[in-house]
Amino acid sequence: MGKVIGIDLGTTNSCASVLEGGKPIVITNTEGGRTTPSIVGFTKGSQRLVGQLAKRQSVTNAENTVYSIKRFIGRRWDDTVEERSRVPYNCVKGRDDTVSVSIRGQSYTPQEISAMILQKLKADSEAFLGEPVTQAVITVPAYFTDAQRQATKDAGTIAGLEVLRIINEPTAAALAYGLDKQETEELILVFDLGGGTFDVSLLQLGNGVFEVLSTSGNNHLGGDDFDNCVVQWMAESFKQKENIDLSTDKMAIQRLREAAEKAKIELSSMLNTTINLPFITADESGPKHLEMELARSQFEELTKQLLEDTRVPLTQALDDGEIRASDVHRVILVGGSTRIPAIQRVIQEFFPDSQLERSVNPDEAVALGAAIQAGVIGGEVEDVLLLDVTPLSLGLETLGEVTTKIIERNTTIPTSRSEVFSTAVDGQTSVEIHVIQGERAMARDNKSLGKFLLAGIPPAPRGMPQIEVSFEIDVNGILKVSAQDQGTGKEQSIVISHTGGLSGGEIEKMRQEAQQYAAQDQLRLRMMELQNQADSLFHTYETTLQESGELVREELKSSGKQKKDQLAIALRTPNTPVEKLQTLVEEFRQIILLIGTEVYQQGKGAASNEFANFVQGTSSGTSQMIESLETNLNPIQASSGITMTPGTMINGTVNPGGMDYVETAPVYGLDDGEEFDFDADETVYSDYEAID
C-alpha cells in the first residue's frame, strides 16, 4: 500500500503531511512553501491556477479568482447571504438550493473548487514522495455538519483520492501535540482559530488514548473576519476623506483585503503599521492614493466584538465537559489567527493557571495530526486510540412537534442508536420521519436535517405497528437514519448529505435559547404531554363505551361525560393553566379506571385488553408521535382482577411479572417512592415504574 497523506483543507491555506519513520512531516509544495493558499484562479486563456500563483494574480483578476470556498461547501443558498456579499466572484444558486460559482460562463460547485486545491496538494505530495498518492485523511472543523463533511469527502473523491477518514481539526491538532506524550495524563484544550472557522475541543490524554470530552465552536469566525473589519475601516475612512466609495470596485476591494491581511500579520509583532496603496482609484481630478496608519490598539478596538465572540465556545466546552478552567493543564494554540496578541490575551485571562502551548506550528498542527491518524489507520502508529464526539444532539420530531432525542450531543462516535415507535392514529399507513438537530424541546426551534416517508404500513389500530428507527453516525461524523416496519420488513433510509449547514450564530443562538427558554420549553412540553394523554383518554373512553357501554351504570356514564366535557373545554381554551389541565386529566383518568373495573367485573374480562392498553397509553405520559413498544413478556395479574397482558407498559417499563414496583405519584395513601409488590394486594391506580 502506498503512502497515506494527511490534509488540512483550510479556508485560507491548506497543508499536507505524511508519516516518515513514525514521525509526521510537512510536505513542501512545488513553490517551496509549507502551506498552500486555498485559492483557485481562472485566467483569460482558460488556464487554471491554484495556490500561490492564483493569489498573485487575484488583484487584477478578482472576479475570476475563488477563495474561502470552504465557507460555502455543503451549505444552502439562503444560509450564505453574508458570505456571498463579501466575495468578488459571482455566486449562483446551484442544484438542491446549494451555492455554485460562475466563472467565465461555467458553473463550479464548492466541491469541484475544493477538489482543485486537493489535486494540487496530491500532485505536490507525489512529487515530494516520488510515488503515486491515492489515499488521504482530510480534516474538517469540529462543527461541520453532516452535509459539509459529506461534501468534503466528495471533493476528495473528485480529486482522485480515497478519503479513508474525515476527522475534526482540533482533534487532529491534539494528536500532533500528544503523540510523544502518551505516558502523560493531561487535560488539554485545543483552541483552533483559523482563516474561516473557530473550534474548541476539550480532551483527556493518557496511555495513548485521546478522548474528546466536549467540543464547541463557530463555523463563521476566523482570520477572514478580522481582515474584513480592517477592510471596512479603510473603505469608510477613504470615503470620508475622498468621497469615493471603494466597496463597489472589486479590484480595489481585493487590494484592500490583501493590505488588511498584511497589516494584521504585522501587528502581531509590531505596535504600528502603515498601509500604503498607491493608485487605489481615480476621479476627474486624477489618481487617488490610500495611506493610513493603523495601531495595534486600534486594530483591537475594530475587532473587539470578534474577540468577545471567542469566549462563548470556551465557556460552552467547559460546561459540556463539566470541567473548571483551573483543571485544564495546557491550551494548544492552532491556526494562524492565534498569533494575534489580543487572542492570546483572551485565552490567558480565561485560563490563568494553564500553559499556552506553541510547540507545534499553528499552521501545520492539524495536517500533522491528520498524518498521524493516517498512520493509525495504516498500522504504522500503534497504541493510539482516538475517541471523537458529535457536537449537537440528533433526533426526531414526534407527536405535537416535540423533539425526541436519539443521540445526545458530545456522544462518542462512531455510534448507533435505535428506538421502536408506533403510529399515532388508527389506520395510519405511512409515517414521516423528520430528522432534526439541536437542543430545544420543540422541533420547530431546532435545525431540520431532512425528511423521508415510510409507506406501506398495513392499517391497524394506533400503537400496534412497530417501527424501528435507527440513527448511525460513522467515524467520519456522517449520519444515516433508517426506519423499518417490523411487521412487513419494509425499510427506508436517508443519508444526510444535501442539507444546509448551521452557522456559528445559529449554533450559539440555539444553545443560548435552550438555556434561556428552558422553563418555557418544559411548560410547552408538559402541555403537549397532557394534550396527548387527554387524546388517549378520549379514545379509550369512547372505545370502552362502544364495546361494553351496557355494563356501565348510568350514573358512572354521566360522571364520565361530565369529566370528558370539562377536559375538552379546557383543551380548547387558550392559556389554560397546566395545573388545572393536569387535574382534569387525572380526574378523567380515574373515572375511566372505575368504568374499566366495572366493565370487567360485570363482563368477566370483556374489557381487559382495552383497559391494559389504557394503562399503557396514559400512565407513561408519552409525548411521542409514535409510542415506544415492547412485547413477548409474561403476563401479570393484580388482585383486583385486572389482567396486564404481555407487553403492557407502566410508565414506559414492561411488566415482567413478580417485580417490585415503586409509585411515582403520591396518591391513594402511598408515599412517593413507597414500594409494594405488584402481584400482591394492590390495584394499579397511578403511574408506577420498575425498580431493581
Swiss-Prot record:
Residue positions, PTM Phosphothreonine: 197
Membrane-spanning ranges: none
InterPro entries referenced in this protein's UniProt entry, alphabetically: ATPase_NBD (IPR043129), Chaperone_DnaK (IPR012725), Heat_shock_70_CS (IPR018181), HSP70_peptide-bd_sf (IPR029047), Hsp_70_fam (IPR013126)
Keywords (A to Z) from UniProt: ATP-binding, Chaperone, Nucleotide-binding, Phosphoprotein, Stress response
Keyword Cytoplasm part of the UniProt annotation: no
GO biological process, one term: protein refolding
One Gene Ontology MF term: heat shock protein binding
CDD domains: ASKHA_NBD_HSP70_DnaK-like
Top-level taxon of origin: Bacteria
PROSITE patterns with a match to the protein in the record: HSP70_1, HSP70_2, HSP70_3
Pfam families in alphabetical order: HSP70
PANTHER family listed in its UniProt record: HEAT SHOCK PROTEIN 70KDA
Task performed by this protein: Acts as a chaperone.
Family: Belongs to the heat shock protein 70 family.
Protein name: Chaperone protein dnaK1
Species of the source: Synechocystis sp. (strain ATCC 27184 / PCC 6803 / Kazusa)
Annotated gene: dnaK1
